C-alpha cells in the first residue's frame, strides 16, 4: 500500500477517517481469514486432475507405431531436444521439439514435417504469479494465447485471451476469467466467465460456468456445471500406495434437432484404474458406451528406455486399435552424475 509523507499533497487520501475505517476493516478481515486455516485449492484447469489426467488414459491413447528419442544437454538449466517418428492415425510422421527450463523461465518449441510450428513461453514473476503464452502457426489453425495466473494463500485467479485482435476496428477473440476460492479447508468453489466475439458483424457471446472441488484425506470429488447445460462430475480415491481408481460422468442436455423439438439427453460414464508396479505403470478404463481401453508403460531396468503398449476395443462398432511406442532418453555420463546430487528445478510449466 502506498505511503505518503505528511507534507505530500496526497497525504489527505490517507489521513482521514474513511481511509482509517476501511484499512482497519480490511486488516481485520485478513486476520479473520487466516484463522480458518485455508490453503490454495488449485486452479480451475486442474479441478479434476486426479481423475482426468492421472488415472484415466484418454490423454495417453494412440494407435500405430511411435518412437521418441530425447537428448538432454543440461540439467540446471534444463535443456533437451527430442525427435519423434510415427506411423498411425492422427500422428505426424516426424516432429522435432526443444525445451528449456529454469526456476523462472519455461520455453518449448515443436515443429512437424508439414511445417506447423507451436511454441510455449512461461515466465514466473514471483512465487505466485506466472504469465503464459502459446503460439501456433501452420496446419490451418493459427493461434495466439496469453494467460496471467496468480495463486493466493486460499484462492487462484487467472485471465486468458485467445486470438485477441483490434485489427477489424473492434475487439474480437475469446477472453476467459477464472476464480477458485477455498471456503473450508476441504471445499473449494469457483466460476469461469467467458466473453467471445468472432467478428464485428456478430454480437458477443457470454457464458458462466460453476465449479466445486472437495478434497478429503484419500479421495477427491469435483463437479462442473457448464453454461451450455453440461454437467461433469468426477470421483477419485487412492485405494493403496500403488493403486488408485476414479470415475468420470458427463451429462448434457441440448435442444433436439427433430421437428417436434424438445430436449435430448446425452451422457457417458467412464471408470478407470491405475496400478504402479516397481518398473511399470498400468492403466485401464471402460465407459458406458462399451469401449474398453488399457495402456502399459514398461521401463527396461536401468536403461533409459520405456516401452508403451496401448489398446482399445469398441464393442458397439466392433473396432479395435493397437499402439506401441519406444522412448529413449539419452544423456552423457556427466549429466547422470549431476542428476544424482542436483536439486530439482521448479519450472513454471
UniProtKB/Swiss-Prot annotation:
InterPro entries: Porin_dom_sf, Porin_Euk/Tom40, Tom40, Tom40_fungi. One of its GO terms (molecular function) is protein transmembrane transporter activity. One of its GO terms (biological process) is protein insertion into mitochondrial outer membrane. GO terms for cellular component: mitochondrial outer membrane translocase complex; pore complex. Transmembrane segments: none annotated. It is a multi-pass membrane protein. Keywords: Ion transport, Membrane, Mitochondrion, Mitochondrion outer membrane, Porin, Protein transport, Transmembrane, Transmembrane beta strand, Transport. Its main location: mitochondrion. The keyword Electron transport does not apply. PANTHER family: MITOCHONDRIAL IMPORT RECEPTOR SUBUNIT TOM40 (PTHR10802). Forms part of the preprotein translocase complex of the outer mitochondrial membrane (TOM complex) which consists of at least 8 different proteins (tom5, tom6, tom7, tom20, tom22, tom37, tom40 and tom70). Interacts with mitochondrial targeting sequences. This is Mitochondrial import receptor subunit tom40. The gene is tom40.
Amino acid at each position: 500500500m502506498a505511503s505518503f509523507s505528511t507534507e505530500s499533497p496526497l497525504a489527505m487520501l490517507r489521513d482521514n477517517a474513511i481511509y482509517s475505517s476501511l484499512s482497519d476493516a480490511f486488516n481485520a478481515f485478513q486476520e479473520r481469514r487466516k484463522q480458518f486455516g485455508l490453503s490454495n485449492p488449485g486452479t480451475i484447469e486442474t479441478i479434476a486432475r486426479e481423475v482426468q489426467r492421472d488415472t484415466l488414459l484418454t490423454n495417453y491413447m494412440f494407435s500405430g507405431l511411435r518412437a521418441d528419442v530425447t537428448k538432454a544437454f543440461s540439467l540446471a538449466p534444463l535443456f533437451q531436444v527430442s525427435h519423434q517418428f510415427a506411423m498411425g492415425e492422427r500422428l505426424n510422421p516426424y516432429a522435432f521439439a526443444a525445451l528449456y527450463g529454469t526456476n523462472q523461465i519455461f520455453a518449448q518449441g515443436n515443429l512437424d514435417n508439414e511445417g506447423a510450428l507451436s511454441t510455449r513461453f512461461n515466465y514466473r514473476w514471483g512465487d505466485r504469479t506466472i504469465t503464459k503464452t502459446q503460439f501456433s502457426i501452420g496446419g490451418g489453425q493459427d493461434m495466439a494465447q496469453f494467460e496471467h495466473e496468480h495463486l493466493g494463500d486460499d484462492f487462484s485467479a487467472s485471465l486468458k485471451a485467445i486470438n485477441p485482435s483490434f485489427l477489424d476496428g473492434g475487439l474480437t477473440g475469446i477472453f476467459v476469467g477464472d476464480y477458485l476460492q477455498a471456503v473450508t479447508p476441504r471445499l473449494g468453489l469457483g466460476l469461469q466467465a467467458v466473453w467471445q466475439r468472432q467478428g464485428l458483424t456478430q454480437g458477443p457471446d457470454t457464458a458462466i460456468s460453476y465449479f466445486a472441488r472437495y478434497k478429503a484425506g484419500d479421495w477427491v470429488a469435483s463437479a462442473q456445471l457448464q453454461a451450455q447445460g453440461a454437467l461433469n462430475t468426477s470421483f477419485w480415491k487412492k485405494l493403496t500406495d500403488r493403486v488408485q481408481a476414479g470415475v468420470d460422468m458427463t451429462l448434457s442436455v441440448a435442444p433436439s434437432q427433430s421437428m417436434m423439438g424438445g430436449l435430448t439427453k446425452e451422457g457417458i460414464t467412464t471408470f478407470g484404474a491405475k496400478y504402479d508396479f516397481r518398473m511399470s505403470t498400468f492403466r485401464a478404463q471402460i465407459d458406458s458406451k462399451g469401449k474398453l481401453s488399457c495402456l502399459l508403460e514398461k521401463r527396461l531396468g536401468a536403461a533409459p528406455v520405456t516401452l508403451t503398449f496401448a489398446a482399445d476395443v469398441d464393442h458397439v462398432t466392433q473396432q479395435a486399435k493397437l499402439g506401441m511406442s519406444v522412448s529413449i532418453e539419452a544423456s552423457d555420463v556427466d549429466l547422470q552424475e549431476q542428476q544424482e546430487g542436483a536439486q530439482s528445478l521448479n519450472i513454471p510449466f
